Amino acid sequence: MTESLLFRGAKILGADSADILVQDGRIAEIGSGLSAAGARTIDADGLVALPGLVDLHTHLREPGYEASETILSGTRAAAAGGFTAVFAMPNTSPVADSAGVVEQELALGESAGYATVQPIGAVTVGQKGERLAELGAMASSRANVRVFSDDGFCVWDPLIMRRALEYVKAFDGVIAQHAQDPRLTEGAQLNEGAVSAELGLAGWPAVAEESIIARDILLAEHVGSRLHVCHLSTAGSVELIRWAKKRGVAVTAEVTPHHLLLTDELARGYDARFKVNPPLRTQEDVLAVREGLADGTIDIVATDHAPHPSEAKACEWQAAANGMVGLESALRVVHQAMVQTGLLDWADVARVMSSAPARIGSLAGHGTPIAAGQPAEFTLYDAAAAGVFAESDLHGQSSNSPYLGRDLPGKVLWTVHNGYATLEDGVLADRGARS
């Protein structure tokens, strides 16, 4: 039996204040002046209560790359950022292209206890793009996989992509595409534009993303299957998704926090913390993806949390790995880029960071409203706080954050998962997890 928790005075979705009583893993009651014998009472006055955040795009690295991250360390980072569920990308070793690997990941997440870990299955065997992986076996496994991706690699062959879309349609699955034409991005180091030209580095053109998105929209429309576009980053990509939705195509899209805030100007210092795939784009692209998220063209925010050991980033730009950690900072960045700018309110944040990703990923028990009878999956956020993002804010095994030393608003204070507090007043709780 879980501990009873009584949070007093939380502002649900940033609006009316209410008490939240948690008992036996569920929200037992919402109201004012609540009391419950034996419940631990927490002063949540003024804190914004949001449904537990759900990340549809996380790299947890286990099995195979535990020097960068483990499922335990990654879900601790998730809890610190207000997340109660993460979808684990399949670029592990072995690749998550079979029922055995996705079930292993699921079990490791259950053992850790800090957040639900929902595996994403690879589209192709070994993520090599040559033949379909065991999509049906992963879907019918205990992991109940519904999202499939070769993220890190594009499913470039149109015949393979068409067959994947056709296959997952049978069980309402979704193909999450890493939209990158590999021929157009050979040797690319950063966004193709003025900055890449000045630095003399090979550019990653916007059309390399947009051409794959355009092709896959047409394939998804032809097949009548669901397509999800990972880490959309250009103004042209936003227009393509907008066009597809007007046509009634079953397409959804995500944007990362870093593409909502940062630009390729940061590459001028050759600091590899800012090297990522797709690359940071221009200020015009940043404004376009913000607008797309605000008007519903882009469905969700997803972190693309990508931890790397220090030696993979503390090197020359050309040799550095792509990727940034983002679980602990995501909500604060969205607060700065979207809420403080007036583009989203807290109810919108709940949609793009909780209910919509859970819906796209067919994840039951998450993304539910903060209401009596619902699963106790929520986070409490101090929107009035502010501070410099520091290494002490990171709780995974890697520190390749682009926000270190940057002023960010807000602070996640409490995360409740499955009725337990995984984060208590800003401190990770001891879940008795595996070591």
Please name every model-derived segment.
Residues E198-R226, R273, A294-D295, D299-V301, ...:
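His/Asp/Glu-enriched, well-ordered alpha-helical/loop segment
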Residues H59-S68, F87-A99, P119-L132, S149-I160, ...:
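Divalent metal-binding segments
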Residues A10, G25, G46, H57, ...:
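Divalent metal-coordination and catalytic microenvironments
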Residues D45-A112:
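Metal-associated gating/positioning segment near the N- to mid-region
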Residues E316, A372-S435:
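C-terminal cap of metal-dependent C-N hydrolases
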Residues A107-V123:
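A glycine-rich helix N-cap at a beta->alpha junction
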Residues M1-G52:
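Histidine-rich, glycine-flanked metal-binding segment
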Residues L132-V301:
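Histidine/acidic residue-rich metal-binding segments in metalloenzymes
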